[in-house]
């Protein structure tokens, strides 16, 4: 018999200490990694529920195990809410991650060796969009597109490459691009060469759900996303479509299960269902609008302080600070800010002369600070602290002063009150 009062704290103090330390770190550090966010206690409640015990291979009403009547309800709720949120006619909520969702799309639509047009990782793309170290770059013939000298996606070059190489699939989406993507233009190019248009909206899904960033679902054949990042749900993946193509939907379902996964994680799917319900609330739209306002305020402040922002600013939740020409690498900037309790990630910038392990930039995002309650004033103050650290990265006194200021603002804006 399992007793409900069994706890980690009294049984595994080493593990509990690590959990406690991480909880304190999240409360006492300012989180600016663009792909991170704070999920709600409701989502964590779902993820810690008895649903974790249930195997449910298959799909609602078509399972390979008995006893699935209640998890069918859970998954159906998640599916219907996802479709409502993004204007889709199809949703698969089973992918364990965004990368596995992307893998399923490749499996459903392509054969190994097929040509794919995807955004260059060095220009803001993602590993799964064709990086040579990823399955996508190993199994398929990848033709990269990128940004022009202004830092914007070069659609004319994209079209030229599409006409020349005749890809079977084109990929839209990014992990480090601060502009607005013209999904309609991408679909025009895809249609011109007879390619599938697949969009990975993982980074901007929350903004899209709230209507503050263009929705790719009406334009793409298939759309994938993570369910965390700006969407602020549990860590997981999602596949959507509004193509009204039942054969396509069957291929996508089969590519997830049994093609790439076994049993779905029902406790995570329950967390997705809760997160989708939260994203349908009016407050979520207010939150996402503030995410963009805060990002714009930060980008403008960086520029005022003499720092270069790739693309000249931001229209979403993130920005890339370009450190080329400064006596400071992305790795050093990351480390210095960490000493001041500000968490970012080093990131390559276009035409970066340094390796991906060192880089000449840092990526900054506002979803997590906005979740804490930061508005423009706090975002501007924070950016000035960041610039103080970068300007004085080898000055321990400056780092210590900024750290105390960070601790103070974190106390005033707790993650979980």
Swiss-Prot record:
Q: Where in the cell is it found?
A: Cytoplasm
Highest taxon, organism lineage? Bacteria
Q: Which GO terms describe its cellular component?
A: cytosol
Q: Where is this site: Plays an important role in substrate specificity?
A: 228
The record's GO molecular-function terms, alphabetically, read:
glycine hydroxymethyltransferase activity; pyridoxal phosphate binding
| Residues in the signal sequence | none
Q: Which cofactor does it need?
A: pyridoxal 5'-phosphate
Q: Does the keyword Chaperone apply?
A: no
Q: Where does this protein act, in terms of pathway? A: One-carbon metabolism; tetrahydrofolate interconversion; Amino-acid biosynthesis; glycine biosynthesis; glycine from L-serine: step 1/1
PTM N6-(pyridoxal phosphate)lysine: list the residues. 229
Keywords, sorted A to Z: Amino-acid biosynthesis, Cytoplasm, One-carbon metabolism, Pyridoxal phosphate, Transferase
EC number(s) on file: 2.1.2.1
Q: For binding (6S)-5,6,7,8-tetrahydrofolate, which residues are annotated in this chain's numbering?
A: 121, 125-127, 355-357
Give the UniProt record's GO annotations in the biological process aspect.
glycine biosynthetic process from serine; tetrahydrofolate interconversion
Recorded hits in Pfam families, A to Z, give:
SHMT
Amino-acid biosynthesis: is it a keyword of this entry?
yes
Query: What is this enzyme's catalytic activity, as reactions?
Result: (6R)-5,10-methylene-5,6,7,8-tetrahydrofolate + glycine + H2O = (6S)-5,6,7,8-tetrahydrofolate + L-serine
The main location is cytoplasm
PANTHER family cross-referenced by the UniProt entry: SERINE HYDROXYMETHYLTRANSFERASE (PTHR11680:SF50)
Hey, which family's this protein in?
Belongs to the SHMT family.
- Which function does this protein serve? Catalyzes the reversible interconversion of serine and glycine with tetrahydrofolate (THF) serving as the one-carbon carrier. This reaction serves as the major source of one-carbon groups required for the biosynthesis of purines, thymidylate, methionine, and other important biomolecules. Also exhibits THF-independent aldolase activity toward beta-hydroxyamino acids, producing glycine and aldehydes, via a retro-aldol mechanism.
Q: How is the subunit organization of this protein annotated in UniProt? A: Homodimer.
Protein name stated in the entry? Serine hydroxymethyltransferase
- What organism does this protein naturally occur in? Aeromonas hydrophila subsp. hydrophila (strain ATCC 7966 / DSM 30187 / BCRC 13018 / CCUG 14551 / JCM 1027 / KCTC 2358 / NCIMB 9240 / NCTC 8049)
The uppermost taxa in this organism's lineage are: Bacteria, Pseudomonadati, Pseudomonadota, Gammaproteobacteria, Aeromonadales
The protein's gene is named glyA
């Amino acid at each position: 018999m399992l007793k409900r009062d069994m706890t980690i704290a009294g049984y595994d103090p080493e593990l509990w200490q690590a959990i406690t330390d991480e909880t304190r770190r999240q409360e006492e550090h300012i989180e600016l990694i663009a792909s991170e966010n704070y999920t709600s206690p409701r989502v964590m409640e779902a993820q810690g529920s008895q649903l974790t015990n249930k195997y449910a291979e298959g799909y609602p009403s078509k399972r390979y195990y008995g006893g699935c009547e209640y998890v069918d309800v859970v998954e159906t709720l998640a599916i219907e809410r996802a479709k409502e949120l993004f204007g889709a006619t199809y949703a698969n909520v089973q992918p364990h991650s965004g990368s596995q969702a992307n893998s399923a799309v490749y499996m459903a639509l392509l054969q190994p060796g097929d040509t794919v047009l995807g955004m260059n990782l060095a220009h803001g793309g993602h590993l799964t969009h064709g990086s040579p170290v990823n399955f996508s770059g190993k199994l398929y013939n990848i033709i990269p597109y990128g940004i022009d000298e202004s830092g914007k996606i070069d659609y004319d070059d994209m079209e030229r490459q599409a006409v020349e190489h005749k890809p079977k699939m084109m990929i839209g989406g990014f992990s480090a691009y601060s502009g607005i993507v013209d999904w309609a233009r991408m679909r025009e190019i895809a249609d011109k060469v007879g390619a599938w248009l697949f969009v990975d909206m993982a980074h901007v899904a929350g903004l899209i759900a709230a209507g503050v960033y263009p929705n790719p679902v009406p334009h793409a054949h298939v759309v994938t996303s993570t369910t965390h990042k700006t969407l602020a749900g549990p860590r997981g993946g999602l596949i959507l479509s509004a193509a009204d193509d039942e054969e396509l939907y069957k291929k996508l379902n089969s590519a997830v299960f049994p093609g790439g996964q076994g049993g779905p994680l029902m406790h995570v799917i329950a967390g997705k269902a809760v997160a989708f319900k939260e994203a349908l609330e009016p407050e979520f739209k207010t939150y996402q609008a503030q995410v963009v306002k805060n990002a714009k305020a930060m980008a403008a402040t960086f520029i005022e302080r003499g720092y270069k922002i790739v693309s000249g600013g931001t229209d979403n939740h993130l920005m890339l600070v370009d450190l080329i020409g400064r006596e400071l690498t992305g790795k050093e900037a990351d480390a210095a800010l960490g000493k001041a309790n500000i968490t970012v990630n080093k990131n390559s910038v276009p035409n970066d002369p340094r390796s991906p392990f060192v880089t000449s930039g840092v990526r900054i995002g506002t979803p997590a600070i906005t979740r804490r309650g930061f508005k423009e004033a706090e975002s501007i103050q924070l950016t000035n602290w960041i610039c103080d650290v970068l300007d004085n990265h080898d000055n321990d006194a400056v780092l210590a002063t900024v750290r105390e200021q960070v601790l103070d603002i974190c106390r005033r804006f707790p993650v979980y009150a």
